[in-house]
Every structure is written in C-alpha cells, then in structure tokens.
Amino acid sequence: MNKKDARIKRAVKTRKKLYKLDAIRLVIHRTCRHIYAQIIAKDNSNVLVAASTTEKLISSQLTTTSNKKAAAIVGKIIAERAIKKGIINVSFDRSGFKYHGRVKMLADRARQTGLSF
C-alpha cells in the first residue's frame, strides 16, 4: 500500500462515520499547488458552498497558492460564504490528510470566522 492508498483508506473510514451522523460536511482537498474546500449537503449530493486557490478572487491576493497564508484565506472565504447561506454547524472532513500545516490553518481560520465544528 502506497501513501496515496493509505490516505484514501483513512478518508473512506471518516466518510462512513460522517454519513451516519447525517451532517453537513466541510470537505477539503490538498494538492502540491492548491487547496480546495467545499461544503456538501447532508444527502452527499449537492455542493452548497465552495472556495479554492484556483479562483481569481483568491489567487490575485497571493504570490503563491501553496502555503499556509493561502489556506487561511480559503478558510476565511469558505466560512463567510457558508454563513451568508445560513450554514454555521458543519462536520470537518479532512479527506485523510493529517491535521497539520495547511489543513490546520484552513480549519482554524474557518472557526475564527464563525463556522462551528
């Protein structure tokens, strides 16, 4: 089993637990260059809110899109958009990534902006 397969296995276990909770999920995905965040509905079919470093609004504020500063901006924007739609409580789905670095920064900034998880 390689590193990617192990991460996907962790992500599947987490998603099974969150599916049983029947909660709105804040899902993140991290690549070498970008970070993506989506808030997905309880029925796992609709993306309610999304933000990523590929958006012009966010990437224009940054010199690089692959650092903690970029993750913090994505966390702030996803939280603001969610609150605007009336979403305050979410479950955090880190997609098998370690809660460290950019993932932690995104989560912390989303909490500071007003999301609860």
From Swiss-Prot:
A matching Pfam family: Ribosomal_L18p
GO biological process: translation
Keyword annotations: Ribonucleoprotein, Ribosomal protein, RNA-binding, rRNA-binding
Record has GTP-binding as a keyword: no
One GO CC term, this protein: cytosolic large ribosomal subunit
Cysteines joined through disulfide linkages: none
SUPFAM superfamilies xref list: Translational machinery components
One GO MF term: structural constituent of ribosome
Keyword field contains Metal-binding: no
Protein purpose: This is one of the proteins that bind and probably mediate the attachment of the 5S RNA into the large ribosomal subunit, where it forms part of the central protuberance.
Protein family: Belongs to the universal ribosomal protein uL18 family.
Quaternary data: Part of the 50S ribosomal subunit; part of the 5S rRNA/L5/L18/L25 subcomplex. Contacts the 5S and 23S rRNAs.
PANTHER family: 39S RIBOSOMAL PROTEIN L18, MITOCHONDRIAL, LARGE RIBOSOMAL SUBUNIT PROTEIN UL18M
Name recorded for this polypeptide: Large ribosomal subunit protein uL18
Organism of this sequence: Blochmanniella pennsylvanica (strain BPEN)
High-level lineage: Bacteria, Pseudomonadati, Pseudomonadota, Gammaproteobacteria, Enterobacterales
